[in-house]
């Protein structure tokens, strides 16, 4: 079975790469993003829209309401193994995402060392200026999406349920938006009515938060097997 693994920090174009590869190969993409398992966080977690998918198939490790919390890495890893097994007859699958905890679960498990041909695309963290330009563009799109709710609309809706607030405070983007509202002494719904100057500050702040997260991801990712090449058979992270 061919497994195409696309991973790297946030805001480095992994989803775009995965969609292009799916168009080329006809294979489905399985997201390795634990936050994307919550449809209520579609925009803020970076779930691509139907239009962005361009006719390709994208799968998720779970479909759960936020009140159940973000799926744990071990559970996500178990679901990942199940999905790979379910698609074995199709001959291949594209795995795409940046969950360091999930990727490290893979690195520690011998399951991935047998019967797979690996094709690995590792997106690296660019310099800060390049990253911030891409991140700001992404955040602006999240604030004004072509389809669906904006990240702020998602936040406002979920904020109305107090028990969800601690979960939101653990997720990049939503966390900074809540901090921004607090610092400026405004309510969450007032974030929907920001002038251009204030919105620019919000965009920059969220992008900065993404950059901090991306640097942390880069430090926590498991190392790709030094012996790996395109079509390599063995453990992708060289642990076994």
From Swiss-Prot:
Tell me the SUPFAM superfamilies matching this sequence.
Answer: P-loop containing nucleoside triphosphate hydrolases
Single GO biological process annotation from the record: cytokinin biosynthetic process
**Please, which domain of life does this record's source organism belong to?**
Bacteria
Give an example GO molecular function: AMP dimethylallyltransferase activity
Sorted alphabetically, the keyword list is: Crown gall tumor, Cytokinin biosynthesis, Plasmid, Transferase
What InterPro entries does the annotation carry? P-loop_NTPase (IPR027417), Tzs (IPR002648)
Catalytic activity of the protein: dimethylallyl diphosphate + AMP = N(6)-(dimethylallyl)adenosine 5'-phosphate + diphosphate
**Transferase among keywords:** yes
Q: Pfam families, from UniProt?
A: IPT
Q: What is its EC number?
A: 2.5.1.27
Function of the molecule: Transfers dimethylallyl groups to AMP as part of the biosynthesis of cytokinin phytohormones.
Q: What is this protein called?
A: Adenylate dimethylallyltransferase
Organism of origin is: Agrobacterium tumefaciens (strain Ach5)
């Amino acid at each position: 079975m061919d497994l195409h693994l696309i991973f790297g920090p946030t805001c480095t174009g992994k989803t775009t790469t995965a969609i292009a590869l799916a168009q080329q190969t006809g294979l489905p993409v399985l997201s390795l993003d634990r936050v994307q398992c919550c449809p209520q966080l579609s925009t803020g977690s970076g779930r691509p829209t139907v239009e962005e998918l361009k006719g390709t198939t994208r799968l998720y490790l779970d479909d759960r309401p936020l009140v159940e919390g973000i799926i744990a890495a071990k559970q996500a890893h178990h679901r990942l193994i199940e999905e790979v097994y379910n698609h074995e007859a199709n001959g291949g699958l594209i795995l795409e995402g940046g969950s360091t905890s999930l990727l490290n679960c893979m690195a520690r498990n011998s399951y991935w060392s047998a019967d797979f041909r690996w094709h690995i695309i590792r997106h690296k963290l660019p310099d800060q200026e390049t990253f911030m330009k891409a991140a700001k563009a992404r955040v602006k799109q999240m604030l004004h999406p072509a389809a669906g709710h904006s990240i702020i609309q998602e936040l406002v809706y979920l904020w109305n349920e107090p028990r969800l607030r601690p979960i939101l405070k653990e997720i990049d983007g939503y966390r900074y938006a809540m901090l921004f509202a607090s610092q400026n002494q405004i309510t969450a719904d007032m974030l929907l009515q920001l002038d251009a100057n204030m919105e620019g500050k919000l965009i920059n702040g969220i992008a900065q938060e993404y950059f901090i997260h991306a640097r942390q991801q880069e430090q926590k990712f498991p190392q790709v097997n030094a012996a790996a090449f395109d079509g390599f058979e063995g453990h992708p992270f060289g642990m076994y």
